[in-house]
């Protein structure tokens, strides 16, 4: 087989994880069967570790499925036959069944009830030397106090979280408000500049109209002069009109 075959690397990790999970499962079963041998903290820790290990094994089995798919896509590269692939698939199937059996036993109603009873006993600090009436009252009194402390702690955490969210929202609102103020000032300045430019354009338009009117009058007068006779008055009139035109142009440039 090829040295690059990734199946055996993942398979070794899965086998180690299964051995660890089986040890945890055995300890977890012992704790539930004999409540006097452990505290509630040990049961909770063992239960969480067992669940995490089973979940990790399931993920590793998915990786093994992917390696088989890779090998099946290119069998020549890994030099594997159908028999070897069947063996690998059988390993994945059997391991997955082992994990499923442990998860099923952990999720049965009887086991859950036993675990709850053990947690309740550890919380209450059960003692066989007390009589029924006194022991029962003390148990439930301690249970109520523990529940009240747990509820108070939960409420405090929720209030602190809500306060943090409110503070973050206030900071965001302040940032948004500042941005809106900046945009408002910018829009006001832009609006004022546009109004000033509009007034300037309007004045310039009036000046152009006035100048155009003056030029039209001059052109009309020049047209009339062109029809005059070529005597001395004609030349005088032309000179005068030319002077007027020159003055108008100078005024236009000055204005």
Swiss-Prot record:
Q: Which gene encodes it?
A: STX6
* Spans traversing the lipid bilayer: 235-255
Q: Name one GO cellular component term.
A: recycling endosome
Family (UniProt): Belongs to the syntaxin family.
Q: What does this protein do?
A: SNARE promoting movement of transport vesicles to target membranes. Targets endosomes to the trans-Golgi network, and may therefore function in retrograde trafficking. Together with SNARE STX12, promotes movement of vesicles from endosomes to the cell membrane, and may therefore function in the endocytic recycling pathway.
PANTHER family the record matches: GOLGI SNARE BET1-RELATED
This one is known as Syntaxin-6
Q: Principal localization?
A: Golgi
| Annotated source species | Homo sapiens (Human)
Instruction: Name its cellular compartments.
Output: Golgi apparatus membrane; Golgi apparatus, trans-Golgi network membrane; Recycling endosome membrane
Which Pfam family, any one of them, does this sequence belong to? SNARE
Give the record's keywords alphabetically: Acetylation, Coiled coil, Endosome, Golgi apparatus, Membrane, Phosphoprotein, Protein transport, Transmembrane, Transmembrane helix, Transport
Write out the ranges of the annotated region (Required for interaction with VPS51). 2-168
Q: How does it sit in the membrane?
A: Single-pass type IV membrane protein
Taxonomic lineage per UniProt? Eukaryota, Metazoa, Chordata, Craniata, Vertebrata
* Residues recorded as bearing Phosphoserine in the entry: 2, 129, 152
Task: Indicate the quaternary assembly.
Answer: Identified in a complex containing STX6, STX12, VAMP4 and VTI1A. Binds EEA1. Interacts with VPS45A. Interacts with MARCHF2; the interaction promotes MARCHF2-mediated ubiquitination and degradation of CFTR. Interacts with MARCHF3. Interacts with GOPC. Interacts with BLTP3B (via C-terminal coiled-coil domain). Interacts with BAIAP3; this interaction is increased in the presence of calcium. Interacts with VPS13B.
Q: Which SUPFAM superfamilies match?
A: SNARE fusion complex, t-snare proteins
Coiled-coil positions are 41-74
Residues with the modification N-acetylserine, per the entry, are: 2
InterPro entries according to UniProt: SNARE, Syntaxin-6/10/61_N, Syntaxin/epimorphin_CS, T_SNARE_dom
One GO MF term attached to the UniProt entry:
SNAP receptor activity
Q: Can you supply a Gene Ontology BP term from the record?
A: regulation of protein localization
Task: Cite the ranges annotated as topological domain Cytoplasmic.
Answer: 2-234
């Amino acid at each position: 087989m090829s040295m690059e075959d990734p199946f055996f690397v993942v398979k070794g990790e899965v086998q180690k994880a299964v051995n660890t999970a089986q040890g945890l499962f055995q300890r977890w079963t012992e704790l539930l069967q004999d409540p006097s041998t452990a505290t509630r903290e040990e049961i909770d820790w063992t239960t969480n570790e067992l669940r995490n290990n089973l979940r990790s094994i399931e993920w590793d089995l998915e990786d093994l499925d992917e390696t088989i798919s890779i090998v099946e896509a290119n069998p020549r590269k890994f030099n594997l036959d159908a028999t070897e692939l069947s063996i690998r698939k059988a390993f994945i199937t059997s391991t997955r069944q082992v994990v499923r059996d442990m998860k099923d036993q952990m999720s049965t109603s009887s086991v859950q009830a036993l675990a709850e009873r053990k947690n309740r006993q550890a919380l209450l600090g059960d003692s066989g030397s007390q009589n029924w009436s006194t022991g029962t009252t003390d148990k439930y009194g301690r249970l109520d106090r523990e529940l009240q402390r747990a509820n108070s702690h939960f409420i405090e955490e929720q209030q602190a979280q809500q306060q943090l969210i409110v503070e973050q929202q206030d900071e965001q609102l302040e940032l948004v408000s500042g941005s809106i103020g900046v945009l408002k000032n910018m829009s006001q300045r832009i609006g004022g500049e546009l109004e000033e430019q509009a007034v300037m354009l309007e004045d310039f338009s009036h000046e152009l109209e006035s100048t155009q009117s003056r030029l039209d009058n001059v052109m009309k007068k020049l047209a009339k002069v062109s029809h005059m006779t070529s005597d001395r008055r004609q030349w005088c009139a032309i000179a005068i009109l030319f002077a007027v035109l020159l003055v108008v142009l100078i005024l236009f440039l000055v204005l």
